[in-house]
Amino acid sequence: MFLSLSTPVQRYWLIGLLIVWAALLFGGFIFGGAPEAARRMPAWSRMASSAVLVVAAFSWYAFTRHTPAGAYALLVAIGMTFGLLGDLALAGFLPGGRNVIAGIISFGIGHIFYITAMLRLAAATGLTNPPARWGALAIWLLVGLAGWYLVVLRGANARGITPGVVHWIALPYALVLAATAGLATGLALQDSRFILLALGAALFLLSDLILAGEMFSGMTFRLIGDVIWLTYGPAQMLIVYSIAHVLARVNR
């Protein structure tokens, strides 16, 4: 993953950030609060793990900015920054306290940057096979629509909750996340280097469907908060570190 970088210092730095991210995320889970709670992981370790990924993403950009992978790295770095803002909004660390709609908007903007990065990558590298690209996109959009219907809309109705504005805002958001997964899958079908990118995008959608169920439909189970983060955190990491595979692709 790191062999396409120019110097050992760059490799060690990005590997080190990966280790710190894993220690914050998984260490926060292992050494967190009481196991009976909905979440063991403390808020500070969750926010810090996302902040480390922002640093990693901009480090990738700094190391690749003079290569054809630089544009992709910058778009991913900006997308990850909006992801961190979304985390802070949902955790209540921004002025005004917890703001679900602001969090959704931040994540949605982040994914628009991810989508733009993938579209530009596909155009630049010739990974534009129509069946792979549009077929994967169509399938994932259907998955996103079905997930929103079952988890958010039907889930709310089943619990006697009248769907409100935020439930309907969740629909285009789910479709944006599904589009990210679809485009990533399209890339992976044409170049196996991007399988981990596709996995990351799929995990992000899964994590957000669980989160939507918790917030909008009253879904609950033991350690649900940790399940959300143990899918979301690796999802963001795989998207950020996909820059390595882009660099390998353009340097071949």
Please tell me what each predicted stretch does:
Residues 1-252:
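Polytopic alpha-helical membrane-helix bundles and their juxtamembrane interface segments
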